[in-house]
Each structure stands twice: as structure tokens, then as C-alpha cells.
Amino acid sequence: TDKLLWRVMSDSGQVIREHYDMAIAYLEGGATYYVHDHVNADRKFTFLHVDYGFAGYTRELDKNCYPDFERIFTVSDEVKKSFVKAYPECSKDTYVFHNLIDQKEIRRKAELPGGFEDSYDGKRILTVGRLTAQKAYEISIDAMKILKDHGIKARWYVLGEGELRGKLQSQIDRLGLQKDFLLLGAKSNPYPYYKQCDLYVHATRFEGKSIAIQEA
């Protein structure tokens, strides 16, 4: 699996010989393994952004890693619950640290030029995220087909890129949704789209705590 690959890649990584007061792994997986195995620091913290079990991680893979961290931060109560279930011995060292967003800056950027360039006058549905299996876009495409078949006047827009673009576009073409479900690619400023849409949808198979939902 990709989780095992990250483990193997970290095992072969270069050791950082400098000594640090503190080292922080910003993400589960490779970053956490690397900080644990190859960084020399007095204190080590790590962050967990996904449901530990649903994301495919296992105690068998990580049992010699997480218990060695002084602090483990999760982005939500549910992520903490899932992690502590796998590592009850880490419960006292695990804390919830919610994602931080700059609301003032988001509102400022939402007022900048940009956003939808068509003249569509129906309901606009928006999703923002990478085009990966985790985000379950194929289900969203099927949902758009149902809306269209029921005569609902709506158009679904997706901001983001990823390895599934070709596969998703093929599904869109097969269902005749070329004008109804649009893959717009990644945008440097997505916030005008948030402001202009009628409904934001975040369909995903698993999630820690979605920053996109917080931003919306």
C-alpha cells in the first residue's frame, strides 16, 4: 500500500545530523516517519489530519512510531477518537488542535475579481478539492445526473486537479453532463467562487476536518 511505501521511503531517508530543540511533523505518514526516524531533537510533535483507521493506517505499521512523540495533535475530536482507539497508551499525549483560517483575509480575497465566467442563471453547486479517490467525485457526478434527470436546473463546478481528471471526465462524457458538471482546474484564488455559489458540497469518503468547509 501507499502507507507501507511511505514507511519504506522514510527508512531509507537521509539523517539530519544537526540537533534541534523541537521538531514538528506537520502531517501523518511520510513527514511523521521522517521526523521520528531521521531528525535529532529534544522534543517531537506530530499532527494527524485524517481518520487514522479510514485512511488506511494501522497499529502494526506505526506501533514503533507514534508512542515516541511527546505530543500528537489531531484536527478534530473525531480524529482524536479514532487515533486513541488504536493507541490508548497515547491518550494523555493527544490533543485537538483545530485548523486555523484567516477569516478576514478570505473575505478580502472573495471580493477580488474572479469567479464564475459563464452567464448561467440556475443554481451553482461548488466543490473544492484534489481529484483523488478520497473525495468521491464519481458519486457527485452520479448525483448530478440524478438532479438533471429530475429536471433540477443546476450546474456543478469543481476546483482542483489530480490524477483522476481523465477518469472523471470520461464519466462526465458518458453520462452526457459536459455542460452540467465542470472540472475547472486549480485556482489561485477560489474565494470568489465560494461567494458566488448557491451551495457548497464536500462529498468525501473520509476526512479529518475539511479546511474547504471552514473556508466556505
Regions found by a protein language model. Give the residues of each.
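A short helix/loop element that forms part of the nucleotide-sugar donor recognition site in Leloir-type
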Residues: 7-12, 106-124
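Aromatic "clamp/platform" in nucleotide-sugar-dependent glycosyltransferases that forms part
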Residues: 186, 205
